[in-house]
Amino acid sequence: MGDKIVWDLYFMAMSKQNKLLRFLKKLFIALLLFLIAYSGYVVIETRNVKDMTIRQKVLKAAYPVFTWLNKITGNKSKVFTNESPASSPQSIYDLTIALNSGDSIPLSNYEGKKLLIVNTASDCGYTDQYDDLQKLYEENKDKLVIIGFPANDFKEQEKGTDVDIEKFCRLNYGVTFPLAKKSSVIPGPEQNPIFQWLTDKNKNGWTSKKPSWNFSKYLINEEGVLVNYFDPSISPTGKEVMDAIKK
């Protein structure tokens, strides 16, 4: 009888393990951010951050821990791969990007290179991925173009103007890859035409996967075929992205 009770308790504990881990993760992050905000401000100030709000500085400092927590709590980051890439019903090279600077550029200019398209935000837990994106761009610019699409769709984490966004990215992360004009990236009447293509399988020929949060990533190959989707928690310099770029 005693053994049965022990086993029952064991299985109950196992069934609640994931829920407990999620709770502990949130609690740990909350405590961490509190401690950073009140005792780590001087340390954050020494990390070459300029024109950042307190929130942005805290998020920047917390990003490595946030990434580590995702790993140890078994976060299932999603990567979708197009196993049978074929020409899309509508060519992405027919589309034009309205840039942050006010200029426009046709995507046909990038034909023959891979394209990594990322929806971005300045006040997100993943904002420090700008650093990884810039590093990825610098190391692969002969074969890869990265384009950031600032958007305020997720918890209003990009409230700045195009001028604010450009300044923030340039001063704090040294961003030199193209930034699009701020727009909406989720399905709806205001959705950016590029993301209309990315999230409609009738246009791209593969998937209707919409961004799950800021810093969702879409990879398009040299022929203009959408071949990968990476969740926000996938680092731009992680193995998943690097392997896809090398193909």
Segments from the language model and where they lie:
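Structural microenvironment flanking redox-active thiols in thiol-disulfide oxidoreductases
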Residues: 126-192
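N-terminal targeting signals for export/organelle localization
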Residues: 13-92
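Thiol-/selenol-based redox modules, centered on thioredoxin-like
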Residues: 193-196, 201-247
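Short pre-active-site segment immediately N-terminal to redox-active cysteine/selenocysteine motifs
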Residues: 113, 120-123, 150, 223
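A short beta-strand-turn-helix
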Residues: 94-114, 135-138
